[in-house]
Amino acid sequence: MSWLEKIIPSISRTETKRSNKVPEGLWEKCVKCDAVLYKPELEKNLDVCPKCDHHMRIGARSRLNIFLDPQNRQELATDVEPVDRLKFKDIKKYKDRLSSAQKDTGEKDALIAMRGELKGMPVVAVAFEFAFHGGSMGYVVGERFTRAATVALNENIPLVCFSATGGARMQEALISLMQMAKTSAVIERLKMQGTPYVSVMTDPVYGGVSASLALLGDINVAEPGARAGFAGPSIIEQTIRQKLPKGFQRAEFLLEHGAIDMIIHRGEMRDKLASLLAKFTRRAAV
């Protein structure tokens, strides 16, 4: 074997090895159009597919970072943490599910609340973390929402909620159902005072959250293509034994049938909500 033949195979093996080393998380596939997207570019586009305009799910903290001005932020109710009061267990202990979700997301529970500014206007904003137990509402979510709404009430500044949830948290039973009444009550206090509450539904919004805080806004908004309803389409079809209309429970269907007030593209959310809230509060947006 010549010296050249000895070198060529090693070069070939090295090149093959290098070409297979693609960093994890660098690419993401759009679930709607199957386009393979470069993650850094996708993030610059606010996680909206540039090919088909599909709005992908984003984390609660990312959502608030996109929405609020970068300065003068204060996270609220960080002392409220989940407790397994019922010692619930199905195929897995609830406390183990909580630990796993906290490890995966880096969050204590499924809702983050912040006081901040939107184009210079003071606001309180809350966002659901769907990656944490499906964004389900238990004691912590209900309590954080209520405390955030109370801050908005006391300071008479708008409250904006970004929902992404499967509904009430099964593992907390009646405690989770109680949050529906608690959050609805504090929203009623906002309405009585005339403090604006804007509900923004992102994909998906179901169950006890849709039956309480998500559809009680002075303005109910949805992102394009977002699904919202009490029960999912498959459950409804099985119950009524009929085929549902195309696009049932999607934002466009809900707007057409008067269930929501408007659909706002993620890239326009800051500008349009700032304009709305400026009219509500008679404050000028910067």
From Swiss-Prot:
It is an enzyme of class 2 (transferase). The lineage of its organism: Bacteria, Pseudomonadati, Pseudomonadota, Gammaproteobacteria, Cellvibrionales. The keyword Iron-sulfur does not apply. Residues 26-286 form the CoA carboxyltransferase N-terminal domain. PANTHER family: ACETYL-COENZYME A CARBOXYLASE CARBOXYL TRANSFERASE SUBUNIT BETA, CHLOROPLASTIC. Its main location: cytoplasm. The gene is accD. Acetyl-CoA carboxylase is a heterohexamer composed of biotin carboxyl carrier protein (AccB), biotin carboxylase (AccC) and two subunits each of ACCase subunit alpha (AccA) and ACCase subunit beta (AccD). It comes from the Bacteria. A zinc finger (C4-type) spans 30-52. This is Acetyl-coenzyme A carboxylase carboxyl transferase subunit beta. GO terms for cellular component: acetate CoA-transferase complex. PROSITE patterns: COA_CT_NTER. Its EC number is 2.1.3.15. Component of the acetyl coenzyme A carboxylase (ACC) complex. Biotin carboxylase (BC) catalyzes the carboxylation of biotin on its carrier protein (BCCP) and then the CO(2) group is transferred by the transcarboxylase to acetyl-CoA to form malonyl-CoA.
